[in-house]
Amino acid sequence: MLFADIILPLSLERNYTFGIPIELHDKVKVGCRVEVQFGKRKVYSGIVKKIHANKPEYYQVKPIRNLLDIEPIVTETQLKFWKWMASYYMCTEGEVMNAALPSHLKLVSETFIVLNEDIEIDAQSLSDDEFLLIEALEIKRSKKGVE
């Protein structure tokens, strides 16, 4: 099985390795964007930095979900420059990627919190923080209804 080291648009000390599904073996190239799941639910577009056959020992590899580019959008020279910039400016390659790529090339999932109108909430049983959160969500919902 092949693996890819992916630069994620996050402030991470290192890049993470993802598995390349068999159907993408011939298509994934260094410099292409791929869609990966990082964490339990977050989905990001990352840049393939390196392709290899070394399975990580300390964590379970997740597969690349999707290939976003047919051809690389970043050259190997640019990737080397990003690494140099990260070292020189004491930041991560993910932070350099965030600054270097236009926002429409970055895929980031978002989490939305909404009230379930079918559930009745007992305000007496809520902690102070829970009460404030519910109150803020109710205010936001009422403002949407006005517009």
Locations of regions flagged by a protein language model:
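Accessory, non-ATPase domains that flank or precede helicase/AAA+ motor cores in DNA-metabolism machines
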Residues: M1-E147
